[in-house]
Each structure stands twice: as structure tokens, then as C-alpha cells.
Amino acid sequence: MDAGLAVEPAASEAVRNIQCSAAADLDPQALIDPAPQARALDQRLISDDRFRALPPKFRFVFNGGGLTHLADADGDIRADAVSTPEGPRYRIGLAGTSATAHSLGNCKPSQVVDVLVELALIFLEERQRLITPARRMRQLIDACGSSPFAGLRDLSRPGGVMADHPPAPEPGRTRAGTVLGVALGCLGTN
């Protein structure tokens, strides 16, 4: 816990399922570095006891785009960086990948944490209305559609262009010198 890898109480640890584009701050093709928003969401989730009711494996995805994109990562609630005439925004989606999620609209990066928190609270409220509470966003949408999530105040109409996300290199097709294989824990300054 001193290293920041876990939190007290243990029940809060279960809600910390946030996937964020790795090294987006170093990626020249990324539209947004989502790490600050992911850290802020993490703090909101662990500081509010209501989120301990989120089911295990309920996942939030922050996709900044670029080389370290998470366009193909499946998430319950996702924020994908898009380029708009007004500047970079997050496209908010439910239950899926960038291509398959139910798109709700766009929001400013400064609003994304509040929007995702509100969506998670709506999920927690709506799942209890089912005979068997939904464990994933897909189950809730299949049961009652995405209408409970419509009309959030901080969302504008969906639009914009996602950052290019090149496919991962195929094994054996990578130029020599572009990949470094190092055993876990062996890369250091000594």
C-alpha cells in the first residue's frame, strides 16, 4: 500500500478497474493523455462507498488514441479521445469497444470524470430494477436499452474523428531493432 499499488479498505480495491492508454503522454499521435483523468476517476471511486457496489470486472476505459490506443479494449463505460473543431474531446460510450459501444455524446476532458461517475451511479441504480441485477453494462442495455443514460448535461452530440490507431505489428514482420525484449524486472540502471 505504501507504493500506491493497493488501497485501504480492501473493498475499495475491487472497484479500481480502470484501463488507460499507456505512455500516451509520450505518444505524438495521441490526442489526449488520459492518465490525469484516470487517476482522478480512481480517487473518486475509492473515496465514495457507493461504488463498492460495482460488480467485479466492471471496467472503465480511457483511450487517448495514437500508438498506445485502446480502441479494441472492451469496457462497460469508455471515454475515447476524438478530434473536433472545438478541440480534443472524449466520446463517451457504453458496453463495447470504440467501434461497438453505444455512443452517448462528447464531453470536454475537464468534464469526463464527472460524466463517468454519473454514468456509474445510473448503472448502480438501474441494475437494481432488474429481477437479477446486471453485472455488466451490456446486460443492462440488453434489458432496458440506453435510455436511462440519455440526456446527461455535460454531453454534446457525438462526433469528431478518432485518432489513427495502427494495428499491432504481426509476429515476425517487425523490422530488426524496433522491439526490445527484456525479462520482467530486469530493465534497470545497473
Regions found by a protein language model. Name each.
Residues 25-29, 67, 99-103, 127-138:
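Noncatalytic linker/hinge segments flanking ATPase motor cores
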Residues 51-55, 122-144, 154-170:
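Flexible, glycine/charged-enriched surface loops at secondary-structure junctions
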Residues 97, 137-142, 183-187:
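Active-site beta-loop-alpha junctions enriched in small/polar residues
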